């Protein structure tokens, strides 16, 4: 389970993992108030990518990452619906 030290590396690897098989990929976001740790985990059951942070500024990056993944999911689904109706 590779744990990334920089957000840029993690986000690239996570997006690549999602695009490889969107139906199997899932994202878990966990916050521990006692430690002040925020952990983002992206997995497809074969590969598990982890990024941990204590920085408040990383929350904005994580929010942007989630919206980017949501856009990819919606774009993928809309293409599939269009293909099924034709």
From Swiss-Prot:
- Please state what the protein is called: Signal recognition particle 9 kDa protein
The beginning of the lineage is:
Eukaryota, Metazoa, Chordata, Craniata, Vertebrata
Q: Where in the cell is it found?
A: Cytoplasm
Superkingdom of this protein's organism: Eukaryota
Protein's gene: SRP9
Molecular-function GO terms, alphabetical: 7S RNA binding
What this chain does, per the entry, is described as: Component of the signal recognition particle (SRP) complex, a ribonucleoprotein complex that mediates the cotranslational targeting of secretory and membrane proteins to the endoplasmic reticulum (ER). SRP9 together with SRP14 and the Alu portion of the SRP RNA, constitutes the elongation arrest domain of SRP. The complex of SRP9 and SRP14 is required for SRP RNA binding.
The subunit field of the Swiss-Prot or TrEMBL record says: Heterodimer with SRP14; binds RNA as heterodimer. Component of a signal recognition particle complex that consists of a 7SL RNA molecule of 300 nucleotides and six protein subunits: SRP72, SRP68, SRP54, SRP19, SRP14 and SRP9.
Pfam family, any one: SRP9-21
Family, according to the entry, reads as follows: Belongs to the SRP9 family.
* PTM annotation (N6-acetyllysine): residues: 52
> Does the entry feature the keyword Ubl conjugation, yes or no?
no
